[in-house]
Amino acid sequence: MALVKTETQALGNHQHSSRFGSLYVGDLSPDVTEKDLIDKFSLNVPVVSVHLCRNSVTGKSMCYAYINFDSPFSASNAMTRLNHSDLKGKAMRIMWSQRDLAYRRRTRTGFANLYVKNLDSSITSSCLERMFCPFGSILSCKVVEENGQSKGFGFVQFDTEQSAVSARSALHGSMVYGKKLFVAKFINKDERAAMAGNQDSTNVYVKNLIETVTDDCLHTLFSQYGTVSSVVVMRDGMGRSRGFGFVNFCNPENAKKAMESLCGLQLGSKKLFVGKALKKDERREMLKQKFSDNFIAKPNMRWSNLYVKNLSESMNETRLREIFGCYGQIVSAKVMCHENGRSKGFGFVCFSNCEESKQAKRYLNGFLVDGKPIVVRVAERKEDRIKRLQQYFQAQPRQYTQAPSAPSPAQPVLSYVSSSYGCFQPFQVGTSYYYMGNQVPQMSGHQNITTYVPAGKVPLKERRSMHLVYKHPAYPVAKRGAKQTLVFKGEVNRNLEAATCSKATTSEENRKEERRLTLSGKLSPEVKVEESGKQLQ
């Protein structure tokens, strides 16, 4: 994609179109605010205003801004001093702002704009500008980056078409840091789409290249079929060949002749594949159609293609073939990789028949490779996988969320007593079952029953007090002297009357028991049965 175009000449060489100095500042970090820009630009020159463009809906920064100065001279000084300097980790791209709509429309067509590729990873936007500035006034210069790393190409826009032509003639094919520069006129998106739709394409795709093949080797091989305008072997972040490249001819007939002659040629240990270069979307659609046709023509193919995941980052196709090769003849093996050549952690292995793939799946599923257990499954088309998942979820019974009903109360029974302690530890008032956590929520309308527990330890034979409790193996035991409170979980409408009668009966029996023990001398007057003041709600 082209750079955002600037619209005026640099001050000193050309007259600025506005009486005020206005600069466009692009490639900003999303975290940059208006205050950051003011602090950065107002160190040596006065800033009149700053406008950071934001999304009208989300309010997020669009990563570019306009800064107005009191004069074009101040703006020129700021651009000279701060262009390509860092602000919150990203290099700013500064250029003159232009309000002339006609000029802006013309720059969108690629006016005086150059596309530069085969750049060394050490070349920055500032280095690229110094390389091209001897040929004229530069409006915009940028090396395209991803995650802070150069992608090996960039754009340079001059103020005149003549300057762009001079730079292209002088620098195209020159060696910079051991790489041959490719400099060409920038072609906008619409023109590229029209060229891609042309069946007589001049761009050729070459794969199955051995690691030692360079751009010069590829140029020598293909130039015997016609004039070659550009050659590139794609490489990862470490500079290693990714095994494929592109060759562009000046004549479509020469490109067609090269494809017919070189496809299948043995180059080193591999056979070349040479075909028409396609856009990523076109290639994906073609492979999708080819895969679907194979499934229709060869139903058994679906069982011979395996999906392998949980692969290490160092996994490559050669190792994948070595691992699966002992179980049969491998038709193809592919490890899906990022642009830097690192494995995405999954891949595909296709065998010549389904019996071989079944054997490989049986013995290699869960097999440790580089310390990781790999997962081997039968590969599915995306449509089949979506359909299978939909059928699975439709077959599951629907679960409706509703308020839980009150649990049926257990029947109250005589409480038994531990041999070590005098009573059970009851649940706290207003809580749910202690041993069930939050599984049984407290329901409104449930009754809280306070029971009567002796304050001290009494002989085992005298422990005959009645308590309304629920049997449960995890029911905790209280220490001696503890005050007991029991939550009776029951339905009000069904058990209110029974609970009231039980409480009255229990209270009366405890008073009689206290009186009898006191008179008989078995219970001291200080030890009393304590009744909570908590009444039935």
UniProtKB/Swiss-Prot annotation:
Miscellaneous comment in the UniProt entry for this protein: A.thaliana contains 8 PABP genes.
Q: Which organism is this protein's natural source?
A: Arabidopsis thaliana (Mouse-ear cress)
Lineage of origin: Eukaryota, Viridiplantae, Streptophyta, Embryophyta, Tracheophyta
Positions of the region Disordered?
503-537
Q: Where in the cell is it found?
A: Cytoplasm; Nucleus
- Where does tissue-level expression of this protein occur? Expressed at low levels in leaves and young seedlings.
Q: What is this protein called?
A: Polyadenylate-binding protein 6
- Gene Ontology MF terms in the entry: RNA binding
Q: Which family does it belong to?
A: Belongs to the polyadenylate-binding protein type-1 family.
Q: Name one GO cellular component term.
A: cytoplasm
Keyword Secreted in record: no
Record's Pfam families?
RRM_1
Q: Which residues form the RRM domain?
A: 21-99, 112-188, 202-279, 304-381
Record key words, sorted: Cytoplasm, Nucleus, Repeat, RNA-binding, Translation regulation
- What GO biological process terms are annotated to this protein in UniProt? mRNA metabolic process; regulation of translation; translational initiation
From start to end residue, where is composition biased (Basic and acidic residues)? 506-517, 525-537
Q: Which Gene3D superfamilies match?
A: 3.30.70.330
> What does this protein's UniProt record list under function?
Binds the poly(A) tail of mRNA. Appears to be an important mediator of the multiple roles of the poly(A) tail in mRNA biogenesis, stability and translation.
